[in-house]
Amino acid sequence: MLLDTIHSRQDLLDIPEDQLGTLCGEIRQFLVQNVSRTGGHLASNLGIVETTVAIHRVFDTSRDRLVFDVGHQCYVHKMLTGRMDRFDTLRQRGGLSGFPKPCESVHDAFIAGHASNAVSVALGMARARTMEGADYHVLALMGDGALTGGLAYEGFNNAGASREPMIVLLNDNGMSITPNVGAISRYLAQARLRPKYLDLKLWYRQTTAKSAFGRRLYALTHKVKEHMRRSILGTTLFENLGFTYLGPVDGHDISRIEMLLKTAVALHEPVLIHLITKKGRGYAPAEKTPQEFHGIGKFDPETGLSETVSVPTFSDIFGQELGRMAASDKTVCAITAAMQHGTGLDQFAADFPSRFFDVGIAEGHAVCMAAGLAKQGMKPVAAIYSTFLQRAYDMLLHDVALQQLHVVLAVDRCGIVGEDGDTHQGMFDVGYLRQVPGMKIFSPASFAELREDLHTAFYACTGPAAIRYPRGAEGCYQVSASQTCIREGYTCTIICYGTMVNAVLSAADTMQAAGYRPEILKLRTISPIDWSTIEASARKTKHVFVFEETSDRECLADEIFAHLIEHGIPAVCCKRNLGRGFIPHGAPAALLAAAGLDADALTKLMQEELS
């Protein structure tokens, strides 16, 4: 196989052009076989194969800087930069990350996990290159979905005005960006890219730059040429922002892409190359339903059928209950930021299209729009992943909390998310949400509690409310408890919230078998806090443990311990959480065990503290 011969960039360059199609087929076969065993982002990587091969044939990413937007389409890049032999560890703890990681390879220029930032990052690198007098190239590879985020346009606006040489490759696999303006447009676009034309253009620019008269002549003729071209073709948004636009072009034509990349380098200015690709290309199941293969678990590569048994998730229950509420209340509406399927809102969108709003990758806008809806008497819920809601923090404070508007946040993927790693773990929402004045925060531990909390947030709250819940299914705790104390005892007090209760109950059972009688307090809301129950329990047991699936910074335990001290309640206090760093990728159970938050580790900690 050709793929087996690639151990360096030179090996890739040595492959004859007429065999590159065969190589791309082998890459796709490798991706399907490996991702079927580990899970991962498949469809987007199948669609970017030829583009990635072309990039690595033109540029040396050990010195040139390739910045990914989002980053989940980096698998082919990793294969071509010496990491094929580690793909059996993809997204596993201690294994290959599913996103770019500079600590993993010199070829990974920048960590990427969130969207729409690549142009800004690339501009910073291009400016650094100019400041240090270096000569490396800077590229940003972004999908068309990233253009739904406003940050991308901030980057384009500044980069175009800067005139810093940089290349943005736009991988367009679905969204129409440039209108089709017919045969003249195609002919002129192709003519502008012919080598003889480009050589003449560069010669003319260099020649006229040698004198003041020449520079004035170039400026005049350039204006005349641009006026004529735009009169015929019109302009793209990117050209209006200062980029030279090349395309659209077939993103599966390697020779064509290579020619465009070399052209972009020669132009020595901000250039956008518009590539049209097919998501899931080369694998029939992914071509048929690319959404299902965007991020997928283990599957049968022959049929494309998932090996994962489908069970209801917190996201599913949220979407179902919200739909029931919307059926009887016409003011209920839902907003999501490009995560309709992930947040469980597919059916809601189908049943209530006039009350469902997918705003794209624009979390700040989502929260602001929710504020406007609430101000006019609607009941909006913004369903956003914990890690992405971070991007809307200013809007939570300024546009929602300041006016105490009744906006409900459905904060999905809280706590350990798993294989997507540190860019996606939901470990900071407890800290940043509790800082928002007037924000009521629910943390349901079961589906039943989620349903009740959703109704409470809509009909018993008057200001902002957040309901935080994890990815996946509920655990052994499946009831709904209105009281904070769910198990009475006297040996010690264990305080927890959310699905952390499952490990706590298991640990408490082991403790009880060993002769201890722990009291368990499960907080239904973490803001406000049920202080009276906590105070009474601490006075009784005089030993308090707080276990949380959140960052140590701004954790609930610190506030609880400070409260007990301030109120003169003597108690030995002990906490355990996810710590102060970032949590890498891996299976959730393995990551929780590594953090000491599984039942066995909690049992050991409590027995040591109480002995």
Question: Which residues does each predicted region cover?
Answer:
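Thiamine diphosphate
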Residues: 89-121, 131-135, 161-292, 305-350, ...
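Catalytic cores of secreted or luminal carbohydrate-active enzymes
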Residues: 442, 457-459
